[in-house]
Structure formats: C-alpha cells, structure tokens
Amino acid sequence: MTKSELIERLCAEQTHLSAKEIEDAVKDILEHMASTLESGDRIEIRGFGSFSLHYREPRVGRNPKTGDKVELEGKYVPHFKPGKELRERVNIG
C-alpha cells in the first residue's frame, strides 16, 4: 500500500473528514516519525511495533556494473521490529 492508497482508503472510511484533512494528518504523522528517528530516538507503537536506528559498520562493497571495490562508510539505517500482536495477526511467528 502506498501513501496515496492509504489516504484514499481512509477517505472512504472516514467520510466525516475531508480528503485534505486526512492527507495532512498522514503527512504530519510520517513527518513526526521521520524527525523522531532523525534525532536518534526510538518510536514504539504498542500492538504494532517499534522503529529504531541500527548502525551499519563501514565495509568494502562492490560496484555491480564494474566489479570494482568501493569503500562504504558506516551509516544508520531505519529498522522496524513488529510487535507481538502484529506478528500474530499476520501469522509471522
């Protein structure tokens, strides 16, 4: 599901809200989540899961086109860990 598909579905279910209100709310939520992660904080949504940053160590990679070795710097990447209720709901484990 894309962001626009989510907005469309919410508009269909929440007929008392305008499409603009729903779009703004979705954008605000995603922006707050991104800025929270950007500041290094963890996000926990009970029953759904948690978002955090994981550090990837520097490593030597390869350019897939040329096969040349490339030094890759260490970096932080977003990580999602599903909560127990979500795992059970989608039957992951």
Curated annotation (Swiss-Prot):
Stored SMART domains = BHL (SM00411)
Q: Which Gene3D superfamilies match?
A: IHF-like DNA-binding proteins (4.10.520.10)
Q: Which UniProt keywords apply?
A: DNA recombination, DNA-binding, Transcription, Transcription regulation, Translation regulation
What GO molecular function annotation could you give as one example from this UniProt entry? DNA binding
Q: Which GO terms describe its cellular component?
A: chromosome; cytosol
Q: Does the keyword Lyase apply?
A: no
Q: What does this protein do?
A: This protein is one of the two subunits of integration host factor, a specific DNA-binding protein that functions in genetic recombination as well as in transcriptional and translational control.
User: Per its UniProt record, what PANTHER family does this chain match?
Assistant: DNA-BINDING PROTEIN HU (PTHR33175), INTEGRATION HOST FACTOR SUBUNIT BETA (PTHR33175:SF5)
Q: Which family does it belong to?
A: Belongs to the bacterial histone-like protein family.
Q: Which HAMAP family match?
A: IHF_beta (MF_00381)
The identity of this protein, by name, is: Integration host factor subunit beta
| Organism, as annotated | Vibrio vulnificus (strain CMCP6)
